């Protein structure tokens, strides 16, 4: 269990209802993956805005809802208002996984062409130097000897922090 207040400590937020002095068992941003006593982050996507499903999330077990605007939820549910829930998800995810990037050396690669090739070249150089590596890319995530096919070309911040934690 994690204290909601601890997960939110890097954020500017307003408590609309309830209290952040509550423990949560999980961090969820997908309405299909709600668990009992979780903190649920509402995300507005291209086709679906989970702010509209906040009451459903609460009914399925969420005890804390993080949203960009006021949402309708049953009494007793904590609602936390933030400016940007995607940004909030990134910071909450880092806290949830105990800030794994702080224990790693991270190399980011940007540009129009050649990012994947560059990433694999850097990985190869580091591995040959005896340095353990991980790689998060558009094709796959590599953690040690495990190769995990990528679901999206850009993973959600939660998935990145989860990978960093491994």
Predicted regions and their residues:
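Phosphate-binding loop of NTP-binding sites
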Residues: 11, 89-166
């Amino acid at each position: 269990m994690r204290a909601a207040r601890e997960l939110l400590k890097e954020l500017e937020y307003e408590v609309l209802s309830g209290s952040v002095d509550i423990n949560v068992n999980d961090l969820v941003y997908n309405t299909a993956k709600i668990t009992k006593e979780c903190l649920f982050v509402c995300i507005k996507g291209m086709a679906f805005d989970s702010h509209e499903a906040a009451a459903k999330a609460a009914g399925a077990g969420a005890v804390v809802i993080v949203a960009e605007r006021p949402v309708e939820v049953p009494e007793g549910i904590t609602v936390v208002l933030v400016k940007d829930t995607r940004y909030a998800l990134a910071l909450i995810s880092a806290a949830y996984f105990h800030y794994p990037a702080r224990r790693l050396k991270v190399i980011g690669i940007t540009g129009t062409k050649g990012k994947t090739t560059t990433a694999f070249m850097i990985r190869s150089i580091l591995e040959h130097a005896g340095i353990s590596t991980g790689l998060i890319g558009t094709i796959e995530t590599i953690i040690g000897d495990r190769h995990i096919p990528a679901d999206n070309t850009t993973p959600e911040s939660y998935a990145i922090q989860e990978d960093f934690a491994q």
